[in-house]
């Protein structure tokens, strides 16, 4: 199924300078390419993929050096800090946070097209950036919006029927992942592979599957929400709306804040976070076996559903509400510190704080905080989150084993709750819809670059003991 309308317009690339600040606050300039062609697929075919294929060949032939040492701590510590993945769209800096094709979140907010001046970036614009490395024009974004609106309904009836076979009480992520699996019957990659497509062309049906999947996951997610919480009364998509606004609309939220600001912001900042996190890595790993994007993304969703990954945004709001129930909304910072210690001493974590890579407060948190300060400064739960942030930084940041930096989950639940999406068990589904943009972008590049099957080596405890004796 062809997802985007072909528009044979390609013109010269132009570039413009976008100012960036690095960790030391000195100024540097990044050349951000833009283009006026409206066909995203043509952009990839005619220039970007051949260029990046040649670049990878050069790296393979010319650069044989080592990029780091593997320690026992890395092997026993979940491979944390071990460099071992090529990830095209993003880089996660421990101090600056995520960069989408070199652009920080504040920079994306400035240069990516919005629905109206001063609004949050349209997710379609981020998708163009992730796939091409170029900042799109509003016309290019509109072409993607139109493509999403024109996406067919193949397999949606199968998806609805499959989800309905589950108990309505099943966890939202169980229903969401099941629905995505049901969409797999329309896979263009599977059909092409069975017909013997040459491996150099693998990326083409992967592109079709990925774009159709991105278009359809909000339909799956909205169906799950309306089935669970609104008596199955579904709302059809509005083809005049963009990706984020349409998703909010199908959920049942019509406020401009939910459309214009919160959902677009949410989808953008949750789209990806480098390749080593559980969901992104799982999608890449499964796809390396030439599983199609539907199978790969469904696997990624199952990883996202874990409490140490995407389920954390659900756990944050539940934990905050437990604080209110036990201590009241007007809890002091000292009382809150005691409650944090109570949680930690019981062998649990405080959800929303600490990260495997990040070493400071980063834009994914601060942009949500700024949004809350502008739109809901008096909300009791937001004020409690603010106190919690201060408690971690003022009282707890000097503890050797504690990583106090807030992550993206620390704020999102409070914002969603304020605007009426109060069902915390559903929050990870929102995360999953967002993650489709980043994971599918990478899957297209995985196949375009011909990346191999992932197959690391494992060792036994005896092997490790012998290695330690030799050291």
Swiss-Prot record:
Show the NCBIfam families listed in the entry: cit_synth_euk, PRK09569.1
A biological process from GO: citrate metabolic process
Cell location: Mitochondrion matrix
Q: Identify the species of origin.
A: Solanum tuberosum
Protein's name according to its UniProt entry: Citrate synthase, mitochondrial
EC number, as in UniProt:
2.3.3.16
Tissue specificity, in the record's words, reads: Ubiquitous.
Keywords, A to Z?
Answer: Mitochondrion, Transferase, Transit peptide, Tricarboxylic acid cycle
Subunit structure, per the record?
A: Homodimer.
Which residues participate directly in catalysis? 309, 355, 409
The record's catalysed reaction(s) read: oxaloacetate + acetyl-CoA + H2O = citrate + CoA + H(+)
Cellular compartments per GO CC: mitochondrial matrix
Q: Which pathway does UniProt place it in?
A: Carbohydrate metabolism; tricarboxylic acid cycle; isocitrate from oxaloacetate: step 1/2
Anything else known: Citrate synthase is found in nearly all cells capable of oxidative metabolism.
The family assignment reads: Belongs to the citrate synthase family.
